Amino acid sequence: MKPMYRSRSWRRKYVRTPGGRVVIHFERKKPKIAHCAMCGRPLNGIPRGRPVEMRKLPKTKKRPERPMPHLCPRCMRKVMKEQIRAQLS
């Protein structure tokens, strides 16, 4: 095993080959799930992927198609209500 693969920043995937041997394939770990910028709640609709994988996805698959995709729906509603109330007053 190469010294670079000894660290746990590489995920170890055990793969059975057609010859019946089990070998280790090393993969980079997936990044953490995206979180809301205000409350920190995990965001739905945003895939966990390394930059190389994310680059291959179309823009609509990378983030929600709505205003303020970096916020969860609850926080987005709060912000929009505050903005509208500020305009009215």
UniProtKB/Swiss-Prot annotation:
The keyword Nucleotidyltransferase does not apply. GO terms for cellular component: ribonucleoprotein complex; ribosome. NCBIfam families: PRK04059.1. Pfam families: Ribosomal_L34e. This is Large ribosomal subunit protein eL34. HAMAP family: Ribosomal_eL34 (MF_00349). The keyword Ribosomal protein applies. It comes from Pyrococcus furiosus (strain ATCC 43587 / DSM 3638 / JCM 8422 / Vc1). InterPro entries: Ribosomal_eL34 (IPR008195), Ribosomal_eL34_C_sf (IPR038562), Ribosomal_eL34_CS (IPR018065), Ribosomal_L34e_arc-type (IPR047868). Belongs to the eukaryotic ribosomal protein eL34 family. One of its GO terms (molecular function) is structural constituent of ribosome. Residues 45-71 are annotated as: Disordered. Keywords: Ribonucleoprotein, Ribosomal protein. PROSITE patterns: RIBOSOMAL_L34E (PS01145). Part of the 50S ribosomal subunit. One of its GO terms (biological process) is translation.
